[in-house]
From Swiss-Prot:
It is found in: Cytoplasm. Catalyzes the last two sequential reactions in the de novo biosynthetic pathway for UDP-N-acetylglucosamine (UDP-GlcNAc). The C-terminal domain catalyzes the transfer of acetyl group from acetyl coenzyme A to glucosamine-1-phosphate (GlcN-1-P) to produce N-acetylglucosamine-1-phosphate (GlcNAc-1-P), which is converted into UDP-GlcNAc by the transfer of uridine 5-monophosphate (from uridine 5-triphosphate), a reaction catalyzed by the N-terminal domain. Homotrimer. This is Bifunctional protein GlmU. It comes from the Bacteria. It catalyses: alpha-D-glucosamine 1-phosphate + acetyl-CoA = N-acetyl-alpha-D-glucosamine 1-phosphate + CoA + H(+); N-acetyl-alpha-D-glucosamine 1-phosphate + UTP + H(+) = UDP-N-acetyl-alpha-D-glucosamine + diphosphate. The gene is glmU. HAMAP family: GlmU (MF_01631). Gene3D superfamilies: Hexapeptide repeat proteins, Spore Coat Polysaccharide Biosynthesis Protein SpsA, Chain A. It comes from Coxiella burnetii (strain CbuG_Q212). In the N-terminal section; belongs to the N-acetylglucosamine-1-phosphate uridyltransferase family. Acetyl-CoA binds at A379, N385, Y386, S404, A422, R439. Residues 249-455 are annotated as: N-acetyltransferase. UDP-N-acetyl-alpha-D-glucosamine binds at residues 8-11, 22, 73, 78-79, 100-102, 137, 152, 167, 225, 332, 350, 365, 376. InterPro entries: Bifunctional_GlmU (IPR005882), GlmU-like (IPR050065), GlmU_C_LbH (IPR038009), Hexapep (IPR001451), Hexapep_transf_CS (IPR018357), MobA-like_NTP_Trfase (IPR025877), Nucleotide-diphossugar_trans (IPR029044), Trimer_LpxA-like_sf (IPR011004).
Length: 455
């Protein structure tokens, strides 16, 4: 018996008040639907089917990298109708697991428990008990605690509305059972929809075993219906991430002001992360790294004993051990800092390597530049790498000293141990071991007076 996962993702999401389909909104930097697919993949199913509707081709276009089979529900006729679109693609002997594209934090542990505790020919659901179950389907049990049916909120009688045990929507049974039960569904209800939950009563009527497992917490089965629910779930997720990192030896100064947006975030023990730090995509921080307040790191690796000072923005960079960056530095894609390099305040780098022990401390732009070891780049240095049509490279060899307010018009090379005088504009190579100055000689104009204002 193989496992086939069906993810229902056709909801219109009107309460999101957005032109973006609900399932494409991110939680922790990853679209809701992608999070559910990633969880499903951990169960090793032989197929994952996504039933989509609202957003149509836009959803497929944005998430076309996901290893799923896409099935369109052309009319929003309910969850039962949605599963009916996918079930023909399942083999009769398959165990089918039904998930929801807007329930992003369901855990593999809960799903494995559901699969393991549901009889091979039976039906199992994930339930939860909520203090306020408004709007959710209620679990109806007999006097012995056996599940009899699931009643949607809008169809529930007054005494049933007092029940706090709810249906999360997550369900498993065999494909053969679903192929038998789904055609029997009707839409005689307040919403005129075909409810998947009505299969529970059909199973009970047949004598099919119906069981359940309880969710570990309310948040893992929380659906996203509007932006406020998404915001609350986002903060819950970020607290989980902060707790996980803290227990692994990372100091998070304030978990309420920390954001991890991506699945591949690896942080070694003894790292300190100050407030309002955002980690996006693939981020690796080695031991004893210190991240100052208001820092953004995206797809970046930082070596041990390095400090990133406040208000720095770093994307797709490699920063090796014992470096210092910022405050107010910007490292753009392709930036590499070799061991012991230093980038100071208001320095911007792109496609540039700053060699071992080299430093650019103040007010500098370095683009398409290769800088060797132990180079000093003075304040106000600019590499002029763009001629209006093409980018050109600048090379600064080991030991060079670049004075303040220097413009290096690429392509050119500054030789080993060369010194460039302050205020120079270079458009040709500077030879090694020599002083190169390219500026007009200073003059004093005698007898000159400032103009005076006309009365």
């Amino acid at each position: 018996m193989g496992l086939s996962v069906i993810i229902l993702a056709a909801g219109q999401g009107k309460r999101m008040a957005s032109s973006t389909p609900k399932i494409l909104h991110p939680l922790g930097g990853i679209p809701l639907l992608e999070r559910v697919v990633n969880t499903a993949r951990l169960l090793n199913p032989h197929t994952i089917q996504v039933v989509y509707g609202n957003g149509g081709s836009h959803v497929r276009e944005k998430l076309n990298y996901l290893p799923v089979h896409w099935i369109e529900q052309s009319q929003p006729l309910g969850t039962g109708h949605a599963v009916l679109q996918a079930i023909p693609f399942c083999q009769n002997e398959d165990r089918v697991l039904i998930l929801y594209g807007d329930v992003p934090l369901i855990s593999p542990k809960t799903l494995n428990s559901l699969l393991e505790n549901t009889p091979s020919n039976g039906l199992g659901v994930v339930v939860a008990e909520l203090p306020d179950p408004t709007g959710l389907g209620r679990i109806i049990r007999d006097d012995f605690g056996n599940i009899l049916s699931i009643v949607e909120h809008k169809d529930a009688a007054e005494h049933q509305l007092k029940i706090r045990e709810i249906n999360t929507g997550i369900m498993t049974t065999t494909a053969m059972n679903l192929k038998k039960w789904l055609p029997q569904l009707n839409n005689n209800n307040c919403q005129k929809e075909y409810y998947l939950t009505d299969t529970v009563a059909l199973a009970v009527a047949e004598g099919c075993p119906v069981g359940c497992v309880a969710a570990q917490c309310c948040e893992e089965v929380q659906g996203v219906n509007d932006r406020w629910e998404l915001t609350k779930l986002e903060r819950y997720y970020q607290r989980l991430m902060a707790k996980k990192l803290s227990l692994a030896g990372v100091t998070i100064i304030d978990p309420e002001r920390f954001d991890a947006r991506g699945e591949n975030i690896e942080i070694a023990p003894d790292v300190v992360i100050d407030v309002n730090v955002i980690l996006e995509g693939n981020v690796q921080l080695d031991r004893n790294v210190r991240i100052g307040p208001n820092v953004i790191l995206k797809n970046t690796t930082v070596g041990e004993n390095t400090e990133i000072h406040a208000n720095s923005v770093i994307e797709a960079a490699v920063i090796k051990a014992n470096c210092s960056v910022g405050p107010f530095a910007r490292l753009r894609p392709g930036s590499v800092l070799e061991e012991g390099a230093k980038v100071g305040n208001f320095v911007e780098m792109k496609k540039t390597t700053l060699g071992r022990g080299s430093k650019a401390n103040h007010l500098t732009y370095l683009g398409d530049t290769i800088i060797g070891k132990n180079v000093n780049v003075g304040a106000g240095t600019i590499t002029c790498n763009y001629d209006g049509a093409n980018k050109w490279q600048t090379k600064i060899e080991d030991g060079a000293f670049i004075g303040s307010n220097v413009a290096l018009v690429a392509p050119l090379t500054v030789g080993k141990n060369a010194t460039i005088g302050a205020g120079s504009t270079l458009s040709q190579d500077a030879p090694p071991d020599q002083l190169t100055v390219a500026r007009e000689r200073q003059r004093t104009i005698k007898g000159w007076h400032r103009p005076t204002k006309k009365e």
